[in-house]
């Protein structure tokens, strides 16, 4: 059971790392927590194959335009018996902006599938599905600079 708790804690840490990258608008740093051949659904592209496409179509259309991205504490995860795959689900909150700069709440949800070569290795996301709750505007209009490394 100790391995299961460690694995779920590692899934939670992955979500926190993603939040750090979103806050910093750190696309380069975020690449390391996603599989190169990932598949994804998102707000700005119905179906994406590849981390580079997810970054171009999704991350760059969201991260620089929102503030205060955070996960709610109740992150859920299930881990396979061999401890090599997992699925995590979480609810997020962030602040979006109308074209005139008025802030609005921007809640949503995420399901992330993870993989790794051996137990104890960091999780890599090989599938993400992030979506806003109903009636939340999809486009936020703030602009922040990308982190330069």
Predicted regions and their residues:
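A short, structured loop/turn motif at beta-sheet edges
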Residues: 78-87, 102, 114-124
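Glycine-rich beta-strand-turn "strand-cap" elements at beta-sheet edges
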Residues: 74-81, 130-134, 142-148
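Hydrophobic/aromatic beta-strand elements that line small-molecule binding cavities or substrate pockets
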Residues: 58-59, 73-79, 92-94, 109-116, ...
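A solvent-exposed, acidic/Ser-Thr-rich amphipathic alpha-helical stretch
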Residues: 27-84, 90
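Short beta-strand edge/turn micro-motifs at domain boundaries
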Residues: 107-142
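Short, low-complexity N-terminal intrinsically disordered segments enriched in polar/charged residues
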Residues: 1-36, 143-149
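Short solvent-exposed loop/turn micro-motifs enriched in small/polar/acidic residues
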Residues: 13, 70-72, 107
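Short, cysteine-centered beta-strand-loop-beta hairpins and adjacent loop/turn segments enriched
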Residues: 65-66, 94-105, 134
């Amino acid at each position: 059971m100790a391995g299961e708790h460690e694995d779920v804690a590692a899934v939670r840490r992955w979500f926190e790392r993603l939040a750090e990258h979103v806050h910093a608008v750190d696309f380069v740093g975020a690449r390391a927590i996603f599989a190169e051949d990932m598949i994804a659904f998102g707000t700005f592209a119905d179906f994406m194959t590849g981390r580079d496409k997810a970054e171009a179509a999704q991350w760059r259309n969201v991260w620089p335009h929102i503030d205060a991205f955070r996960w709610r504490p109740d992150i859920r995860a299930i881990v396979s018996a061999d401890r090599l795959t997992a699925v995590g689900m979480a609810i997020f909150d962030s602040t979006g902006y109308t074209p005139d700069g008025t802030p609005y709440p921007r809640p949503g949800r995420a399901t992330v599938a993870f993989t790794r070569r051996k137990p104890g290795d960091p999780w890599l996301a090989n599938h993400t599905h992030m979506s806003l709750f109903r009636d939340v505007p999809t486009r936020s209009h703030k602009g922040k600079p990308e982190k330069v490394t």
